[in-house]
Amino acid sequence: MTVYVSETVLLTRVLIADDSIMLRSGLRKLIEEHSGWVCGEALNGRDAIRRIQQRAPDILILDLCMPVMDGLEAARAINKLAPDLPILLCTPDLPPSLVSMAQGCGIQGTVSKYDGRQIISGVEALLRHETFFCRN
């Protein structure tokens, strides 16, 4: 859902789901440096689902390894709940097998969680309704 702030300014809502407060904080700072993007945060996959139900974001940045509900399990559930929501999976390693599993869960992009430029490029691609799969 795009938030209309005035006649000329649109905000894109990005939800970050990661169990690491340091990573969420860093991603938030990186995302909010981009004009017109605002962030929400979730602690794990289950929390992401709850936040998506409360306030529909325009895109989800989802960590793979989280307690309570991991990224792939969350992606499956989120695709049933909000099938049009673009999901960008962030993980330290991107072997071809993981990329294939992510695609099978309805994820539209995979990036290294430690490459800020790659994350921004992935978000931009998904917002243009393109896929963005990086591999190691």
Q: Where does each model-flagged region fall?
A:
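Non-catalytic signal-transmission and effector/linker regions of two-component phosphorelay proteins
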Residues: 1-13, 120-136
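Conserved sequence signature across two-component system core domains
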Residues: 17-18, 42, 60
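Two-component/phosphorelay signaling modules centered on CheY-like receiver
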Residues: 21-40
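Acidic catalytic/metal-coordinating carboxylates
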Residues: 44-47, 70-73
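Active-site beta3 strand of CheY-like receiver
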Residues: 55-61
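Receiver (REC) domain active-site loop signature in two-component systems and cognate sites
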Residues: 66
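Alpha4 helix (beta4-alpha4-beta5 surface) of REC/receiver domains from two-component response regulators
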Residues: 73, 94-111, 117-121
